[in-house]
Amino acid sequence: MKGEQIGVFYHKSRFERKEFGSFFLSETPEVMSKGWDADFRRMCVWTKLFDKQSNQAFYVFCTHFDHIGTKARIESARLIVSKIKTIAGNSPIILVGDLNSSPQDTEMYHLLADYLTDTAISAIKKTIPTAGTFNGYDMKISDFQANQKIDYIFIQKFKGLDYRVLNDRYNDLSYPSDHFPVMCVVSY
């Protein structure tokens, strides 16, 4: 497949993959396609993991919303909530991704936040040295605005313990990505 590739990484020593799949963020999600007013084909991948330590199964969904299409982001959020309900049912959920949109983009954000919990808000401990998660490779920390938070970790039936935005520079010269890594320690 040409274009975007998204993966879910996990430790095989702790987790066993039980199921996996993907769908496109479009009106025809089962077919490779570009949706609504999107500039690129975008997708969501998912996997069902079994935690060998806790004997619990849960689902991880990973996505990347379009950076141009406002309607595409709104409809992608609506589609993901629908797919999560269909695929995962009542199971614990983790949804991660670059949503290319701030929480102030209320319709897109609330479609997700009304069903899932944003760990940036709900986690017991938060280490957020910057307001945003997008750095453009060379932005100074002082340049960050709250509306530059475009990367998210949403959960359902988990408790967010420690949410962090990691803003380390490589050799103090540049960032390894145009986005800061976002992480959250969770528990059942």
Where are the regions a protein language model picked out?
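Structured beta-strand-rich core segments of catalytic domains in phosphoester-bond hydrolases
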Residues: M1-A57, V165
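Alpha-helical elements of Rossmann-like donor-binding domains used by nucleotide-donor carbohydrate transfer enzymes
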Residues: E4, W46, E75-K83, E107
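Conserved hydrophobic/aromatic beta-strand scaffold that supports enzyme active sites
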Residues: I6-V8, C44-K48, C62, Y152-I153, ...
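Short beta-strand segments enriched in hydrophobic/aromatic residues
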Residues: D51, H64-F65, V186-Y188
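Hydrophobic, aromatic-enriched interface-forming segments
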Residues: C62-H67, K71-S76, I80
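Active-site metal-binding loops of divalent metal-dependent hydrolases
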Residues: T63-F65, D98-L99, F180
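Metal-dependent phosphoester-hydrolase catalytic domains
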Residues: K71, E75, K85-I93, S101-Y188
